[in-house]
Every structure is written in C-alpha cells, then in structure tokens.
Curated annotation (Swiss-Prot):
InterPro entries: EXS_C, SPX_dom. Residues 90-110, 161-196, 211-228, 337-349, 952-970 have a biased composition (Low complexity). Pfam families: EXS, SPX. Residues 1-483 form the SPX domain. Belongs to the SYG1 (TC 2.A.94) family. Residues 244-264 have a biased composition (Acidic residues). CDD domains: SPX. It is a multi-pass membrane protein. This is SPX and EXS domain-containing protein 4.
Length: 1081
C-alpha cells in the first residue's frame, strides 16, 4: 500500500495541516534531480569562491589547481552562492556583494559549451598544453572586436604563454607590463552584468572576459553577436566602475539608467532573490536593499578579502600575479611581490575602502530616481531545497506533537484534582458530575492514542522520504536522518505511553474498583461501533429508496390525476405551505451532506459552528433524520394530490399541509431526548439569538442561521415581486388572488424581517470590532433587499402602469443590488477577488482546501447565475403569458434558493477554516459544570499551601537557631576542658537537656500541623500520585519532553551540518556536470 493512500486513510481531519507534506517533499526531490546529471534544466547553486576565479585560473599551476579541486575550493572561507541558469545567451560577470549574475552554458552549433568549475578546467589544461605548469603570467582580457578575431587572440595567447615558459628571467618585466596593460583597462565601463563592455569613447564592443577557456573553444564556430534583448538590457552598474571612471563620466557624459532583472542577496544559509517586474513600488526595493545592506557588516567582512580581490581581477582591475613557478629565483619573487604591492597601492583600494565603496554604491543605486523607474517591483522569494523543507516539516510535526501532549497532561492533572474535590462535597457529587470526570479521562486517553498514531504515521512518512532521497544523495540523507532521530518524536521511551498507562490505572482505581481489564474496556475510544454504523447505513439506504419511489409517484399522480383545469379552492395556499415546509427540510439534509464533505476534507466545522466537542455526532445520523422528514413530506404531498382528484374531499384538502406543518413543528420543539434533541435545541437557541440582534453578541453560528432565514425571505420576496409588479392588469384571477397577498401590509413586513436581522447583526459586529470591512460591507447587501421590498410594495399599491418611475427605480435597484450581492459573496464571505496586486492566485485565494480549482470557478459561475434568477423570471413574465404561480415552476424556483444557501454556507465555512487554520485547530477545553465551586476550592487550596510553606520555613529557621546554639555550647565545652570533670559533665548534661527541650516543640509542632491540616487528608488518599511539595497529583516522571539548551544546541548544530554538506554536494554535482565540459579544439 502506498504511503499516500495510508496517510489519507488514517489522517485526523482537523489535524490535516499538521501532518507531513509528503507530496511536497517528493516533488522537491523530483524537481531537484530531474534528469540529473545529464541536463541543467533546473537552477543550481555553485560556490562563488570557485566560479569567480574561473577566469584567473591560469595564475595557478596545474598542481595547485589539483590540490584546490581535492580540497573543494581556494580556501575554507565561507562561500557566496550564484545561480546557474542556461536560458541566457552568454556567460556573465559575477558581481559580488549585490548582483550574482547568471553563469550560463551557451551551446554552439557543434555542441561546444563554456566551462564552470576547476575540475573541468584542470582536465582541459592538461589536454591543451602540458607545459603550462610553470606559467605565472597574469590573465589577459580577450578583446573581441568582432567574432572573427577570437581565434587570433587565442593563438596569440598560447604563443605568449609558450614564450614565457622559455624565458624565465624576464618574468618580472612581463608582470609589470601586464599590470600596466590591465591598469589601462580600468578606464573601461562595464555596461552590462552579462558581457557587454563600453570603451572609453562610449562605443559598445562585444567582449568576453576571462581566459580562452571561458570563451568558445578552439575550432568552434565564431561567437554570435549579442541578441537584441541583451543589448536592450545594457546597464551601467556603478558597482563595476572605479572612482576614476565616475569622475570622467561626470565630466563627459551622463550615467545611463540601471536596469536590474535579478538581485541575489546571499546571507549564508538564507538565499534571497529579488525579482523586478513591470509593476510594483520603489519603496519595496529600497526596503529589500536596506535589509541586505544591514547584513553586510556581519557577513561580507569575512568574505571581503577573497571576493573583492577576485572581483577586481575579474573586472580588469588586477591587483597582481600570484606566481607559483618553482623554478623562479627568490629574488625574482621578491621583486614581483614589491611591484605587485606598488601596483595595488597605486591603482586599487584596500579591503576597507573597497567595502566602503561598495556600500556607498548601493546607496547610490537606491538614491538614483531615474534608475528607479526601471525597478518598479520587488518581491522576495526563498529558494526551495529538500534539506530545508525537510527540517521545516520535522520541526512542524515535532512542535505540534509536544504542545498537544503537554496540553493533555495539564487536563489530566486538572481531572485528578477534581476527584478529591467531589469526594468531599456531597452536593456536587452527582451522577452528571462524576460522568463528566469519567468522560474526561476517556477523552484524554483517546486523545493520547490519536497523538501516538499521529507520531507513528509521520515518522513512517519521513523514513519513506529519506529512503527515496537516499538514492539521489546519500550524504544529505544521512544528515537529515540524524536530525530526525534527535527530535522528540523519535524518542524510544515515549511519555505519551507513560501518561496513557497512568490514566488507565487512575481510572481503574476510582471508577472500576482496581479492575484494570474493565477500565481498559471502558476507556477505549468512544466512536460508534460497527454495529451502529451498519444500522445507520442500512436505514439511510432504505429511506433513500422510499424517497425515490414516492417522488416518482408524486410526479406521476400530478400529471395524470391532479385537476389542472379546476384545482381546489385553497390550492395556492396549500402549495405555499408545502414549499415553505420543504425548504428547512432540504436545508437540513444538505447540511448533513456538507458536514460529511467537511469532515473528509479536514475542515474543522465542529469548532467553527461552536458545537460541544464532548457530544457524539455523525453526518450519517443527520442524513438519516433529514431523509425521515423528506419521506414524511412526500407522503403528505402524495396524499394531497391523490385526494384532489376526488370532488368529495376537495373541501378538506387544506388540512393535509396544515397538519404536516404542525407535526413537523411539534417534533422540532418537543423536549424529549429523541430525534437528535441536542441539535434541535441548538437550532432553536440560534434562532432566538438571531431574533435578539443587535442586543446580543454575534458569533458565526448566528450568522449561519440568519442565512438560512434569508433564503426563506428571498424566496417569498422574489416570487411575489416577479409575478405581481408588472402586467398586473393581465394576470389571471388566481394570480390576482396570489398577488393580493403582497398588497397586505403584514406580508412585506414579514419578508423584510430576515434582512433586518442580518443588518442588525452586521452593525453589532461593527460595534464590537470597529471594522468597516467586512461587516458594513455585508450589511449593505441586505439593505439593497429592504429598499427593493419597499419599492415593490409601493408599486403594487399606487402604480398600475408597466414602466412607471417607481417600477424603473425598483428594476434599477435590483440590478445594482444583484451585482453588489455577487461581489459581497465573493469578496466578503468567500475571500475571492481580493488583493489583486499581492495575491498570486487571484481571483481565488492563496489558501484553498480543494486542490482542483475548477470547483471554485464552477461555484463562482453558479452564484452569479443564482443572483440573477429574478431577471430570468422577469423576462418570462414580460415575454409570455405563462402562469408563474404554477406549482411545478415555484417548486423548482425554491430548489434554486436551497442550492444558493447550501453553496454559500459551504464555501463560507471553507473560507473561515483556511483563513485561520491555527485558531480552528487549537486545543479546546470542555467547560466544567461546577467551575465556580472548583475554582474556589483550588484558591483555598493554594492559600493553605502558602501558609504551610511559611510555617515550614519558620520551623526550619528555629531548627537552625537551635543547632547554632548547640554548636556554641559544644565549643564552650571544649574550651573549658582544662577544668574538672564534674563541671564538664554538668555543662554537657544541661546542654543535652536544653537540646531535647528545643526539639520536642518541633515534633509537637509537626504533629499539630498535621492535625490542623486534617481537612486536606482526602488529598493523601491518592498518595501514590501525590507531589509531596505541592499536594497535587503528580504526573511528572523522568520520561518527559524537554526544551533545554542542550537540545536546542544539538538541533542547531545538526542544521548547520546539513547546510554545509548540502553546499559541498551541490558544488560537486554542478562541477562534474556533463554539460559543463569544454569541447576539444
């Protein structure tokens, strides 16, 4: 069985967000090693210390390069990461500190690629020229005036190197000449962080920085010219410009705008990428850059020497040559060092000045208003990798597990303290209170079992992921396994099992007469047994079959036996009663289906609706009761239709729907504990709270109930408005009678009451929170309905024309109100269409419960259609003489209201869940029925404990004083030992007598205190679980989860080890990549 299926089968719905994200970790593994090591489709990380010196590798001998490759770098200093991406057109100039440009592999027609990494450079040097071992010439800039001159420069380069191997005595002059030539190159302005360089005269030349081995290989086709896109993205970076260049440009020409596509800020373990798009604000970029500037003094000082030297060499500002020629004389080395130092002092900045220069250039970039026009957006993204995601997932599971264990332990201690409280209080020692304590032990035992299953399932998932990752990277996998084994969820001695064992024995001691076997049977999970589930399933299936049969019979009798031409006299009222009674039945049935989906999808609807968590509930049971009422409704309707075909019974037909409504009301309000009495009472309480608005606080269940009442009012209001407002003179007699009800003042008032209750709730919420959105925004939605209802009444009462001013106003209010209601449904209640600029998932939310987004788009479309259903009815009314009071038409219209209310509540609960996942997965305490008395008892107990501690302290002080007196007397006795023996014996006997008299009050005092605290003797009846210091039941043991400093240090060191090994492994994987090999010339 796959772990994915195992996780879905055993997951606890309201803990769904706390489990291991197995699919996410698997996707990271597949994404990180997709087709590796044969392609570079994904972005990888390499060491800056190695890639940045790629162009100066010729300064070192082959032996030195080999030693560096084996050691993994030039030195052991921290490294800066740059991103490798093969989508660009040409190799880039890595700019340290701020912009780490992309180093790319540019494939030519013959497959030639550029090289990155010392290992391939080492092999290529051996292939090209075995005589380069003694070379010490500095790197020359290969200046490509056009693509045809590349091979000439390469040949001249090798000729020069071969000549230098034969003439060792003139190395010093060559070094000086090369330094002077490189110093002259400092006047060049690097215009693009890729490969576009500007000459002093402002002309653009396509140049390649570095050695011939970083350019296209010998024998390959000429290098193509820069693409128009690259030329368009030319920039003048002040970070790559010396002070001399800046002075010249201030005199001669203006600085060009800076266009940055990507800034990578490296903060050791945190790699932050700043991406600029066409939209955004300058403040975001300034904020991000300032945040990075603050980290420079901490991180860059360690890297400044190496990176700045490499940067200066890479940009043409050469500090000097590192000569590794073993055959050179010591005098030549000294001369070279002196000359190099002189050149460095004259032409370059020291490390501190270089650091100050770079920070000042950052500020210059931020303060340049013209350049900021091209950097209008800045978003921070964190690069994803497996090791970081794995550590985050482990920490999430571990912290949640330990937190819930400690919460459960606190509840167990509280329940144990209730036992002596109830044993001494006869008035509160009722069956209900005793059952509360017993149920509390059972709930905590079941909760601990769930925690243990949660731990085992997550550990199994982590092991599965590590086994998969071990095939790709054994080093990092072993480090991650060490980190997992050091967490608290991986401990062998589980405190959860110990606490479960203690709860079981306490339950056996106080509730089953020390019968542990009986306690085990009673304390097990309280879920419905298989027999009850099978009974529910059988009943549901039977009721569904009965409903289908009765529904078919109703349709058949209505078409063939119902008198359509001469219906009963009271048929409009009868059909209205049937429709009104059907709406709450269908809403209750749909709620049972919604609760089933919520439970399966992990939405904690129990907490959102504020149901009591200690009550047993099942969506199947709700569905069963809903189907029972549906069956009764279909029976009554079938009886009415069948009886209407007989003329003798038509006079009494109105009694059938009336009796059915009365029976339904009686069942709903009857006080006996049958037919889900807790749910029925909960509904009645919420209806009372809705009616009491705005004088009572409003919670989410009250909002839910007001929506249910709104669906009834919306139904009555829409039907009467559409049928009666227009073409009143052309209505049939039955329709006129139907519309006359709307002209009665009481009916519009009744229709407006649900809207008024909803407005009152919104204003109450605004009074409590002072938030205009979403409370006043939601109230406006109901205000539109009230205004339309008032205009409807006025139009029926005073206007007889088709298009009077009042009717036009009514029509306009309905159109505007429908659009606004749709917007409020989406934005206020479902959380859609919000934050266009910052929400990447617009028009949806960022957090969604269901992964298939088409579900939400279907819901949006359906809500829009249902909000404009009145317009469809209006079109039918104006375009035909179809009777809109037809029972079948009104029945289907009522179904649309049920669909709207069901869909609205379903996604409203889903939005409420995802917007506050931490709140709705929190630990909820069941209220104590005797909380006030118990709190008073605990307060008195704390006071007695404090008095007892004070007494014990005073007694200890008295004992210490007595002991000091005895010691003083003993010293006197030893000092007077020269006297006669009789005196000595007398003093000693008197001291012993005094000592005995001083100790007896302490013993008496202890006995007195024990008698004085005899009222606490009931606490000692469970002395095997008592804490001798506090008097509370003790659940502490040596086996417990700790958050000490040693544990945190171990975790921190393991995280550092994972990060260090990951950087080395990534470097080795990239440097050994086949796509990075240099093709032979």
């Amino acid at each position: 069985m796959k772990f994915r299926d195992l996780l879905n089968d055993h997951i606890i719905s309201h803990w769904r967000d706390k489990y291991i994200d197995y699919e996410y970790l698997k996707d990271l593994i597949d994404r990180e090693y997709h087709n590796a090591p044969n392609s570079l489709n994904n972005s990888m990380m390499i060491d800056m210390s190695q890639s940045i010196n790629n162009t100066i590798a010729e300064q070192y001998s082959v032996n030195d390069i080999s030693s560096m490759v084996t050691k993994g770098g030039i030195n052991d200093s921290p490294t800066t990461d740059i991103e490798v991406d093969e989508t660009a057109d040409s190799p880039a100039i890595p700019s340290p500190i701020i912009s780490h440009s992309n180093i790319n592999s540019n494939n030519n027609n013959n497959g030639g690629t550029n090289s990155v990494g010392f290992s391939h450079l080492h092999r290529q040097l051996n292939r090209q020229n075995s005589n380069l071992k003694n070379s010490s010439n500095s790197i020359n800039l290969l200046k490509a005036d056009d693509s045809n001159n590349i091979e000439k420069h390469v040949k001249s380069y090798f000729d020069q190197r071969n000549n230098n191997n034969n003439i060792n005595n003139i190395n010093n002059n060559n070094n000086n000449n090369s330094n002077n030539s490189n110093n002259s190159n400092n006047n060049k302005t690097i215009k693009n962080t890729r490969n576009i360089i500007a000459d002093d005269d402002g002309g653009n030349e396509d140049t390649t920085l570095g050695s011939p081995f970083s350019s296209p290989s010998i024998g390959s086709p000429p290098m193509s010219s820069p693409s128009p896109k690259m030329l368009k993205q030319e920039l003048h970076s002040p970070l790559l410009t010396s002070e001399k260049d800046e002075d010249e440009e201030e005199e001669g020409e203006e600085e060009e705008d800076i266009e940055m596509e990507q800034l990578e800020l490296d903060d050791h373990d945190k790699n932050t990428t700043i991406n600029m798009t066409a939209n955004g604000s300058r403040g975001n970029l300034r904020k991000g850059m300032n945040q990075f500037v603050k980290t420079i003094p901490q991180n860059i000082k360690q890297l400044n020497s190496q990176i700045s030297n490499s940067f200066l060499k890479f940009g043409g500002m050469v500090k000097g040559d590192k000569s590794n020629d073993k055959n050179n004389d010591k005098s030549n080395d000294k001369n070279n060092n002196k000359n190099n130092k002189n050149n460095n002092n004259n032409n370059n900045l020291n490390d501190e000045d270089n650091f100050d220069m770079m920070t000042s250039q950052i500020e210059k970039v931020l303060n340049n208003k013209d350049n900021m026009k091209l950097m209008e957006s800045c978003t921070f993204t964190t690069k994803e990798n497996f090791q970081t995601a794995f550590v985050d997932q482990v920490n999430k599971v571990d912290s949640f597990f330990v937190e819930r264990y400690r919460k459960t332990k606190e509840k167990c201690v509280e329940l144990c303290n209730m036992i002596p409280f109830l044993s001494t209080n006869e008035q509160l020692r009722t069956i209900r209170n005793i059952e509360f304590v017993k149920q509390g032990f059972q709930d905590n035992y079941h909760y601990l079992e769930s925690l243990e299953a949660f731990k085992e399932l997550n550990i199994k998932g982590f092991k599965k992921v590590l086994e998969k990752y071990e095939k790709k990277n054994r080093i990092i996998s072993s480090e991650c396994r060490k980190y997992l084994e050091n967490t608290r969820i991986f401990e062998n001695d589980s405190p959860v099992r110990f606490l479960s064992h203690r709860i079981k024995h306490l339950y056996a001691r106080y509730f089953t007469g020390n019968d542990v076997k009986l306690a085990s049977n009673q304390i097990k999970t309280y879920a419905e047994d298989e027999r009850f589930q099978k009974y529910n399933l059988f009943t549901i299936g039977l009721l569904i079959g009965v409903c289908i049969v009765l529904g078919i019979q109703v349709v058949f009798n209505y078409y063939y036996y119902y008198p359509h031409e001469q219906p009963p006299i009271d048929s409009p009222l009868a059909w209205l009663l049937f429709r009104i009674s059907l709406l709450p039945i269908l809403l209750g049935t749909m709620f049972s289906l919604m609760s089933f989906i919520w439970e399966k999808s992990g939405i904690n609807y129990v907490f959102i609706f504020e149901f009591k968590p200690d009550h047993k509930r099942s969506p199947g049971r709700y569905l069963k009761y809903g189907l029972i009422f549906n069956t009764l409704w279909l029976l009554a309707l079938n009886l009415y239709i069948d009886s209407s075909s007989h003329q003798n019974t038509t006079r009494y037909l109105i009694l059938i729907p009336i009796v059915f409504v009365l029976i339904t009301l009686i069942i709903g309000i009857q006080p006996f504990p049958i037919m889900a009495h807790r749910t029925r009472f909960w509904v009645l309480k919420k209806i009372v709270k809705v009616v009491s608005a705005p004088w009572v606080p409003v919670r989410f269940p009250d909002f839910f109930m007001s929506v249910q009442l709104l669906s009834l009012g919306e139904f009555l209001f829409n039907i009467q408005s559409m049928v009666c407002v227009f073409n009143y003179s052309a209505l049939d007699p039955e329709e006129v009678k139907f519309c006359s009800q709307s002209r009665f003042f009481a009916l519009p008032v009744l229709n407006a009451l649900p809207y008024w209750w909803r407005v009152a709730q919104c204003f109450r919420r605004y009074y409590e929170t002072r938030q205009f959105f979403p409370h006043i925004t939601s109230a406006i939605r109901s205000i539109f309905s009230i205004i339309a209802l008032v205009l409807n009444y006025i139009a029926l009462e005073y206007s007889q024309h088709d298009w009077s001013i009042i009717k036009i106003a009514w029509f306009g209010i309905n159109v505007v109100g429908s659009f606004y209601k749709f917007y409020a449904d989406m934005s206020v209640d479902w959380g859609f269409f919000n934050n266009y600029k910052t929400n990447p998932a617009w028009p949806l939310r960022e957090k969604l419960v269901f992964k298939k987004k088409w579900i939400y788009y279907v819901a949006i479309t359906l809500d829009f259609f249902l909000r404009f259903t009145w317009l469809i009815i209006f079109s039918i009314r104006k375009g035909s003489k179809h009777r809109l009071d037809n029972p079948l038409f009104l029945f289907f219209f009522s179904l649309t209201e049920v669909v709207w209310a069901t869909q609205f509540i379903f996604f409203r609960v889903e939005s409420e869940h995802v917007q506050s996942p931490d709140t709705y997965s929190s630990f909820q305490d069941i209220p104590i029925p005797f909380s006030q008395e118990y709190n008073n008892y605990m307060d008195e107990k704390k006071k007695r404990r404090k008095r007892k501690q004070k007494q014990s302290k005073s007694n200890n002080n008295n004992n210490n004083n007595n002991n000091n007196n005895n010691n003083n007397n003993n010293r006197l006795h030893h000092n007077d030992s020269s006297n006669n023996v009789e005196t000595d014996e007398t003093i000693t006997s008197s001291n012993n007598t005094d000592s005995s008299h001083q100790k007896q009050p302490l013993t008496h005092n202890r006995h007195h205190n024990h008698n004085h605290n005899h009222q606490d003797h009931h606490d000692l009846s469970i002395n095997d679980h008592m804490n001798p210091d506090t008097g509370d039941i003790n659940f502490d043991s040596k086996i417990d989860y700790k958050d000490d400093e040693a544990y945190n240090l171990r975790q921190s060191s393991l995280r550092t080890s994972i990060s260090r090994n990951a950087s080395h492994v990534d470097l080795g994987r990239v440097s050994s990549h086949n796509d990075l090999n240099i093709s032979r010339g």
